[in-house]
């Protein structure tokens, strides 16, 4: 016998004894459970229905103990069952399903979907006016627990919803009462209801009651069930609501302490403050000043936030001042222009200079270098020159600094310095101060801010702590001041609701979601279909989630286009769509990628434009509508003659329609209501072959026409993109801000660009072109950008010394160059 043979035989002998002892328990206990598990799994993948993820996850959870045990001891079990092919096959099947069940189910579902597409081909060809394309059919047939249909502009979003609804009724025999269709407006819900009913009657000869609702009407129905009566809606008009808020303001400001809080906010915190060093260019700072309408109470355009604060302090304390009045001594030289101190107090013959320096005397680089000097050195030279003038002419100078504002002592220090010079500091009465802010239209704007905040505060179910936690540190003091004036408004508002046994729109959703979570209302929906899903808000999300959590078998089918998410200002959160699985778990996603609206040139330009934002879901849309000529034209015109240029373009479109012997539809799209053309009747009369509608970009969503003109695509506060910014107090309650510049405005411009089937014209300005135009047509711009602020352009101007080139951002940017190019 060879060495080791006896030892090996003995080991084998004991192993056989061990496995013989285990074998009965495997056969009697584990194999029975495995057979049951495999039989269940086979039912999922050999049936006549789509197999969804939740079924598999529940199966896997049920058999987790067996799966874990077999995973650890698979080799031993195979050894034990040697020679028993049936049991080994069972063990193998279970192990395969447990470890790789997703792949097995995916293969089954692909086969199932292919079979359904074939079996339902007649249905898909006839249920809508035009046959559903393959992607639309696949979206209908997939029956996952959570389904996200990403529908590009013109790709048949509504067609897909109609197809899904009809498929559930006709093919899956779903009870219509268990299908809930949610839309964001009553008009959309009604249109969907009518369209589905008509198709069901015409094609399937079925009279079906369509359960299409808005989120609010669904919520109201739930509250009615819980209360056993239909609650009244408070303030049935916007006018009544605003009247109520004005009355609350007048009532609250009778109280001295509240009035002091209110005035404190108006005087110290009305506009959000950002220090100069927070900006990377002068142009950025100018845009911030303009976007937040940071002007003095005397309606002056000053160069900085800090100067406005100083001006308002002087004004509110009855100290007469002149802004940038030329110094009373002539100082003009080859090196410097005539000196103009920031403020002059004529009654006291005192000058005030506000220096934009930090504690180290430094300034941001964008303040501008001069010849061979860095920005800080150049600014310091300017400071020394100005101070030397006051010393030379023995004039009184008070100096303030940017770092004092950042430290919260700017006005306190200014007040002490003024007192040292004997300046009488006497604040206007509360009534006078409030009247000045009323006259400046600031109080109505603040009440509007409070109302907007109230709606978002309620709809998101925030607390004061939530609001402060969402705020950056440098805005917490301002936010705390705002909350002091907001809470009494909120308490009066809620008190009014209770006294009148009423609810508001926020209650319809928030309270309904609460009652669903508490099972005070139990639904029986098998399917929830949501249209325009990109517009969902966090409050509506919580409502939907409550419905799904209450009934795990309920399936969700959402259709939307993140490229067309344009309602963040009302609380919508596009990230709920772009991060769908984070909010709803595993989902089947499909992109409807064939547009039936516009041609390939409009498709390419618009798709490239919107996808510059990397956060948008990537889509490769396609179309069968191919054209040779470029259907997009950008026309540069002066804004004062834009309407005459608009008329010319419309007449040209009219001629094109006339040559075709047709009447064509046309949109004139503007960013704002006030910017709609005044001469629309004149245009329509001059263009009998056109049916013209003037609409805003927001209103144009979902609509289409043969031609479209997008007007006034310029830069500025009321430009496109909009130069106004939301108050941080409001944005703190909205979804997380997007990192990409003008993200929502970019999507809005995409919506405007994708309304035309055949041709689109964009009207812009060479003097104030929109940044979108700079991007779309950089070669078409003839004016040079300002090298100082970077956001303005240089245009020809006339002065006492003749023509020169100046920046369009004047008076904030005072860069000039003579016509020969000498600065």
Question: Where in this protein do the model-derived segments appear?
Answer:
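Active-site beta-strand-loop-beta-strand hairpin of nuclease catalytic cores
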Residues: 339-361, 393
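Conserved RecA-like helicase ATPase core segment
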Residues: 382, 387-388, 541-629
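C-terminal accessory regions
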Residues: 714-782
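A short beta-strand element within the Helicase C-terminal
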Residues: 693-726
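Conserved helicase NTPase motor core
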Residues: 25, 32, 53-54, 60-73, ...
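Helicase P-loop NTPase motor core
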Residues: 149, 158-161, 279-281, 291, ...
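Conserved P-loop NTPase-based nucleic-acid remodeling module centered on helicase motor cores
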Residues: 16-49, 53-62, 178, 183-266, ...
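Coupling/switch/interface segments within P-loop NTPase motor domains and analogous charged loops
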Residues: 52-90, 234-296, 346, 400-496
